[in-house]
Amino acid sequence: MKILHVCSELYPLLKTGGLADVLGALPQAQNQIGLDARVLLPAYPAIIAGIPNTQVVAEFDNFAGHVVLRYGEYNGVGIYLIDAPHLYGREGNPYHDAYYNDYGDNYKRFALLGWVGAELATGLDSWWRAEVVHAHDWHAGLCAAYLFNKGRPAKSVFTIHNLAYQGQFSYHHLYEIGLPTGMFHVEGLELFGQISYLKSGLFYSDASTAVSPTYAQEITTPEFAYGLQGLLSGLKAQDRLVGILNGVDENIWHPNVDQYIPHHYKLKYMAGKKKNKAELQAYFNLPQDESALAFVMVTRLTEQKGVDLLIESADEIVKQGGQLMILGSGAPHLEQGIRELAERYPQNIAVKIGYDEALSHLMVAGGDVILVPSRFEPCGLTQLYGLQYGTLPLVRKTGGLADTVVDSTSESIKACTATGFVFESATPEALRHCLQRAFALWQKPRAWAIVRTDAMAQDFSWRKAAEQYRALYERL
């Protein structure tokens, strides 16, 4: 079965979030179970630099101007690149300029991505024709609309990685992107008086997926649906919306092979974890104290990620003699709040504003607890990395966090199912109480070791997800 993944990021060449990690691993896992998966991407400078050897598949002019479609390989996966420098030849973030202003031609840049995705199901490459076009997030949402317009020559699947980003553009762009005005309708592309690329993906695809079972349920409710609850609950009722958990790329995220950490370790040989903790404490200029409970957080600094909840309750970590290390960037007021914490408690709290791939690996490997107190979290990958590395996740019960972390209670520890710490209410008080429970378990080294062992024994391999996607494709 020939699968075309249509997306806008690919780890490690270009990454702004978890979407890139998924596309860096899922196609490879699908090929390993006998599918023929390829990826379609815009030819951003970072992508071209990483895939320099390509051949021309097609050259054409359409609503987006002059376009060259190229084909190459990366990590054994076939990659199509849409080479249109006037649209994609911009360094840095693929969606906005250095001042965080969305590019004014995003409607055209991502319409072209969807258009080429549909054309690859109708013979644009005479050697390979997609049987399933699998589009990811709003950037690729128009794939399904173009396929619908062509009489549905292939099956279509749309994956929601984050429903909060909807790709909404003015109605008057419709004629510029080659779609009939009849599609601008509540039973179509229209959402709140605008074109919604995300809604297009949901409405016109044969099936949609969310990146965890709980998130697939949550987005049918007004709190999480951003005005799409009617459409989403309808899809759920028809069994056209399912949740499939993301996996972990074990070639990159495994403590026994991780190229970024100085000391490898595994479940049966944990000495390396203590050494990584000492390295991490040294990096952040915190006391190299093995007995201090070390909390780490690697995140975008936004309210969605619960950073404000942590700012309000971090003094609990200090009070109990713990340490807190944070890596991330985001909202200026939250960056400032985190910096002030580090200045107030220099012996206990340290922060690095920005992103650093190598440091993020050392933090996951060297920490004792990884904090993911999100208000909502479609799937979440950092808690999965935490489980893999024996760094117990402390999470809020939402989305993929609820599906992947089992709270440590006396019952779950006895039953060998506990894998971390879970709190329900998105309040500083609830987070504070959960931090206290983590300290209480840390005082019982044998119980802590049991939970850590059970955490590391979890299977979140991409093979599992690849099999679930295959089952979905086969029933379309």
UniProtKB/Swiss-Prot annotation:
The keyword Transferase applies. Gene3D superfamilies: Glycogen Phosphorylase B. GO terms for biological process: glycogen biosynthetic process. Keywords: Glycogen biosynthesis, Glycosyltransferase, Transferase. The keyword Transferase applies. It catalyses: [(1->4)-alpha-D-glucosyl](n) + ADP-alpha-D-glucose = [(1->4)-alpha-D-glucosyl](n+1) + ADP + H(+). Pathway: Glycan biosynthesis; glycogen biosynthesis. It comes from the Bacteria. Synthesizes alpha-1,4-glucan chains using ADP-glucose. Belongs to the glycosyltransferase 1 family. Bacterial/plant glycogen synthase subfamily. This is Glycogen synthase.
